[in-house]
């Protein structure tokens, strides 16, 4: 009978009803003149709505303090699920805007990150009438891009780690507003070191990067016209072989694909399959090499070739890997094999 009396309560309990639980944050500006947007849900007698608070200051921590002065309750970031960063802001040292989130034990390290094109306010205005939280909306949106192999999955934790890695560079989802003021994927933002280079990959190149990186989501599609007819395939399996020498890294890819769209007849004909395989091989190889040229131009080793060189060919690795990466010959050779042509065969 005495045991319950000896038990103590949770000394660090924090009730959501006493906090403004922020799910989405957006940054724009630069250190010395930072603006941040904080979105959190608020229940009224009629509906659930999203409140957006703007803070200004010289740093992310200062901005947070400024925003706290405008809320009726203390802001709680324990349910933060998405962080948006303007493209101009990301061209500075990105870690300056993330540092404070690693220093508070109550902050999650799993939020999604994305670079946005245009005014930050538009991305927050969109969510004000949503029933779900703002952060949830963008979290699901980015997760959908990951599942379709359009972007490489990164969280606050994994992205933060890469910013300290000198043998691989970060790539983040690049999002813009479409004509109907809805967010849409605009490709991938390429980083070199801790800063956004201003260079991007389009969505088709995003799929190719995921194939090259062997980081496929639920589905990876390649689509084109073949002899005037639509042709679409799903990448089923990727085999990759990398050969390293002092001034060249050769990458060989073997793709096993499944045909998901091809209205023409005779798909079971062996010669037809061979012709399509050659068409896809030429297409993917050409576009892969074009994508690699863009990565090298941006000095952005997005697939971590530097890690492979550092681990297995130490004498070829240089501390300024970004510069070395941009000067290497990196030919990519592709072989596409059709392993399935339809649902039943």
Feature names for model-found ranges:
Residues 1-345:
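Membrane-proximal alpha-helical signals and transmembrane carboxylates
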């Amino acid at each position: 009978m005495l045991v319950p009396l000896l038990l103590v309560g949770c000394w660090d309990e924090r009730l959501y009803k006493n906090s403004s639980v922020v799910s989405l944050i957006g940054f724009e500006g630069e250190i010395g003149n930072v603006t941040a947007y904080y979105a959190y849900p608020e229940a009224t007698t009629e509906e659930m709505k999203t409140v957006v608070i703007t803070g200004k200051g010289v740093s992310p921590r200062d901005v947070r303090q400024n925003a706290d002065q405008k809320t009726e309750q203390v802001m709680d970031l324990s349910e933060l699920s998405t962080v948006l960063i303007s493209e101009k802001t990301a061209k500075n040292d990105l870690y300056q805007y993330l540092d404070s989130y690693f220093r508070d034990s109550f902050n999650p390290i799993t939020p999604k990150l994305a670079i946005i094109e245009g005014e930050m306010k538009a991305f927050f205005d969109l969510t004000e009438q949503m029933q779900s939280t703002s952060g949830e909306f963008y979290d699901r949106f980015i997760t959908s891009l990951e599942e379709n192999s359009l972007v490489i999955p990164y969280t606050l934790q994994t992205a933060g780690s890469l910013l300290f890695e000198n043998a691989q560079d970060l790539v983040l989802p690049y999002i813009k507003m479409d004509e109907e003021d809805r967010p849409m994927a605009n490709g991938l933002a390429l980083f070199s070191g801790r800063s956004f280079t201003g260079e991007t990959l389009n969505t088709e190149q995003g799929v190719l990067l995921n194939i090259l990186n062997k980081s496929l989501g639920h589905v990876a599609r390649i689509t084109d016209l073949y002899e005037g007819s639509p042709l679409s395939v799903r990448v089923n399996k990727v085999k990759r072989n990398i050969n390293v020498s002092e001034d060249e890294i050769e990458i060989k890819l073997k793709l096993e694909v499944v045909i998901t769209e091809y209205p023409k007849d005779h798909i079971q004909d062996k010669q037809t399959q061979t012709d399509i395989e050659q068409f896809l091989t030429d297409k993917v190889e050409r576009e892969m090499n074009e994508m690699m040229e863009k990565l090298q131009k941006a000095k952005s080793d997005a697939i971590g070739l530097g890690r492979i060189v550092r681990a297995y060919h130490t004498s070829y690795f240089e501390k300024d890997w970004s510069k070395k990466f941009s000067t290497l010959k990196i030919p990519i050779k592709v072989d596409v094999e059709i392993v399935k042509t339809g649902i039943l065969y």
